[in-house]
């Protein structure tokens, strides 16, 4: 019989995704057939699954941890925010429409069927399924029709372990408050809790464990320290961009403007791992550094809206001066579209302005269209003469004079554009920098020897390290029962 466990958080960003990945790798290392599952995810960091649809990149990483091919059924409902009030809805890997918050609330009962169908598919033949919740089950205003947390857990009869983040403070109140506010039906699903991101002497929290037990009756299944290896894993949420620090004194400064609807920002993780790169995330209100050698404009879920914001920050003028000084620019997906002369949206797909002038650094224009490209791709960089693998997730078609100088060839077709002076490059291909050969060639073009480290191998090693750290601190009896053959 397939065993199931669900990690739900006392809030967002408590570390559920990493813990699920770590448990998946721990189970896989012990010979179990383990699968990750997340009923509903909200993220603009999407991946193309091995069966050709869109899922959250956290579930893609968890599949890697489980050593199984990724599937659309691992994340049957993916919400991709396009504005403060509306999201694109992806169901079992395919776009199913758009909805605002209240509209989506009405849709949730209909989506439960797809969630349960996917859960059954994932569970078939598995020894263990590790499920990840979303946000917090204590948001009882969202409980009616819920498919992300307790609504799913009660329907699928999956036991729940709560995760509390002690690093942000107030973890006892978060756990006890969650117990107090949950209805009895939901409270019965909780079997215990984990404390995550603990720093220092764990025995200092013994009284805290006793207090939580006194108020809730829940056992503690482990106090997890701050997992250093997790820093080597791709990040899921853009909130981490606020926590990144600069690495001064390195050979190349790479500046990345933080867009309001930034998407697939984990494209940049391999650059952050390079010892000779100072990766700087430029936040609203700050200029693009004048000493940057390279500016990377990442993907966006709202190209026109982010382009308007880009200009409002004065980054367009910063970028022009950067190029005049001899600096280089790479635009990926939405960033590529912004670099052109014009972006139009005649059908109102993005829900905002219908046309806007681009940054004018590439002689191309983009028109948004409803057909969405979603695929894994093998490519050849014409600029650096290396083979690489990546993926495409985009709307719109880009054409113009600079497309006559494509930046890459993807599966024998031209993609992207290169400016006449070679300083500005755009492409729809995500995952460029994950290729060690491409990253090494790029750095070499700046006079830097780099890219020697195998990035994919380093991610895999980090998953092993996270699994080993969890095995050392989790309650042995609970873990043995979870991982029994």
Curated annotation (Swiss-Prot):
Pathway: Cofactor biosynthesis; adenosylcobalamin biosynthesis
Keywords assigned by UniProt, alphabetized: Cobalamin biosynthesis, Glutamine amidotransferase
Listed GO biological process terms: cobalamin biosynthetic process
PROSITE patterns reported for this sequence: GATASE_COBBQ
Domain GATase cobBQ-type: 251-438
Entry superkingdom: Bacteria
MF (Gene Ontology): ABC-type vitamin B12 transporter activity; catalytic activity
rRNA-binding as UniProt keyword: no
InterPro entries membership: Class_I_gatase-like, CobQ/CobB/MinD/ParA_Nub-bd_dom, CobQ_GATase1, CobQ_N, CobQ_synth, GATase_3, P-loop_NTPase
Active-site residue numbers: 333 (nucleophile), 430
A Pfam family of this chain: CbiA
PANTHER family, sorted: COBYRIC ACID SYNTHASE, DETHIOBIOTIN SYNTHETASE
Similarity comment text for this entry: Belongs to the CobB/CobQ family. CobQ subfamily.
Function of the protein: Catalyzes amidations at positions B, D, E, and G on adenosylcobyrinic A,C-diamide. NH(2) groups are provided by glutamine, and one molecule of ATP is hydrogenolyzed for each amidation.
Assembly description: Homodimer.
Protein name in the entry: Cobyric acid synthase
Native source species: Sinorhizobium sp
Gene for this chain: cobQ
């Amino acid at each position: 019989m397939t065993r199931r466990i669900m990690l739900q958080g006392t809030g967002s960003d408590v570390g559920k995704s990493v813990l699920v990945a770590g448990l998946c790798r721990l189970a896989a290392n012990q010979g179990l057939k383990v699968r990750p599952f997340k009923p509903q995810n909200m993220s603009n960091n999407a991946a193309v699954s091995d069966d050709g649809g869109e899922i959250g990149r956290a579930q893609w990483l968890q599949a890697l941890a489980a050593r199984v091919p990724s599937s659309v059924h691992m994340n049957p409902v993916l919400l991709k925010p396009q504005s403060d009030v509306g999201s694109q809805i992806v169901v079992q890997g395919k776009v199913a429409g758009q909805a605002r918050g209240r509209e989506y609330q009405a849709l949730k009962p209909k989506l439960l069927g797809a969630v349960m169908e996917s859960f059954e598919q994932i569970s078939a033949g598995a020894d263990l399924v590790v499920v990840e919740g979303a946000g917090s089950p204590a948001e009882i205003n969202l409980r009616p029709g819920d498919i992300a947390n307790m609504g799913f857990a009660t329907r699928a009869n999956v036991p729940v372990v709560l995760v509390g983040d002690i690093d942000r403070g107030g973890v006892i109140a978060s756990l006890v408050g969650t117990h107090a506010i949950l209805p009895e039906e939901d409270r019965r699903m909780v079997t215990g809790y984990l404390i995550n991101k603990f720093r220092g002497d764990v025995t200092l929290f013994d009284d805290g464990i006793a207090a939580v037990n006194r108020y809730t009756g829940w056992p503690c299944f482990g106090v997890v320290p701050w997992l250093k290896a997790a820093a080597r894993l791709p990040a899921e949420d853009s909130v981490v961009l606020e926590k990144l620090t600069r690495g001064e004194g390195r050979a190349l400064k790479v500046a990345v403007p933080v867009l309001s609807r930034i998407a697939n920002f984990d494209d940049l993780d391999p650059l952050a791992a390079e010892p000779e790169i100072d990766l700087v995330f430029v936040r609203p209100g700050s200029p693009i550094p004048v000493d940057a050698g390279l500016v990377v404009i990442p993907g966006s879920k709202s190209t026109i809206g982010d382009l308007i914001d880009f200009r409002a920050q004065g980054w367009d003028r910063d970028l022009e001066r950067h190029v005049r000084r001899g600096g280089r620019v790479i635009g990926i997906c939405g960033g590529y579209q912004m670099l052109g002369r014009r972006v139009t949206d005649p059908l109102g797909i993005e829900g905002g302005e219908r046309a806007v002038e681009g940054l004018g650094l590439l002689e191309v224009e983009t028109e948004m269209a409803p057909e969405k490209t979603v695929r894994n791709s093998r490519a050849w960089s014409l600029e650096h003469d290396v083979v690489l693998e990546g993926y495409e997730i985009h709307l719109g078609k880009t054409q113009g004079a600079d497309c006559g100088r494509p930046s890459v060839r993807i599966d024998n077709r031209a993609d992207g554009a290169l400016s006449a002076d070679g300083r500005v490059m755009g492409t729809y291909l995500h995952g460029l920098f994950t290729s060690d050969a491409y990253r090494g060639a790029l750095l070499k073009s700046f006079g830097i020897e780099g890219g020697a480290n195998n990035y994919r191998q380093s991610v895999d090693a980090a998953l092993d390290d996270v699994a080993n750290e969890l095995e050392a601190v989790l309650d042995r009896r609970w873990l043995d029962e979870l991982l029994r053959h």
